[in-house]
Swiss-Prot record:
Enzyme class: transferase
Organism of provenance: Shouchella clausii (strain KSM-K16)
Reaction(s) catalysed by this chain's protein: pseudouridine(1915) in 23S rRNA + S-adenosyl-L-methionine = N(3)-methylpseudouridine(1915) in 23S rRNA + S-adenosyl-L-homocysteine + H(+)
CDD domains membership: RlmH-like
Assembly information from the UniProt record: Homodimer.
Function of the protein: Specifically methylates the pseudouridine at position 1915 (m3Psi1915) in 23S rRNA.
Coiled coil spans: none
Name listed for the protein in its UniProt record: Ribosomal RNA large subunit methyltransferase H
Amino acid sequence: MNITILSVGKLKEKYIKQGIDEYKKRLSAYAKIQEIEVPDEKAPEHLSTEDMRLVKKKEGERLLAKISADSYVIALAIEGNMKTSEQLAKNIEQLGTYGKSKIAFIIGGSLGLSNDVYARADELLSFSKMTFPHQLMKLVLFEQLYRSFRIMRGEPYHK
């Protein structure tokens, strides 16, 4: 299985990068993992509604340009469906069973995702109704993917 994690902005926090690197290493035993960061759009601190839409549109175009046409796209969004770790594992396993060997997870920037990204997404996934820094969500996503593969293989994982 090929999994791509696409996100907006460069990861700056060293401790988050270290955590992601650890989970990428662990995940390499189960799947081919690719991490792609697209530049965030520079914007003034106080944005109008139209400015926010334009920023999300530009960031969305950068994200969409990196997704292959045959990828199953899961966008992380507050309004998405929440799943247990077991449900996420089953979902990933079923995608592989039904021939979806390329999965792309998309994490938006600080303003969220554009309507075009939502339109391209095959599924919306939420980890919480709370808002989290997108860089922290990347670490959480990597951990949940690792946990999912351990669950799929019936391997123990510390709870």
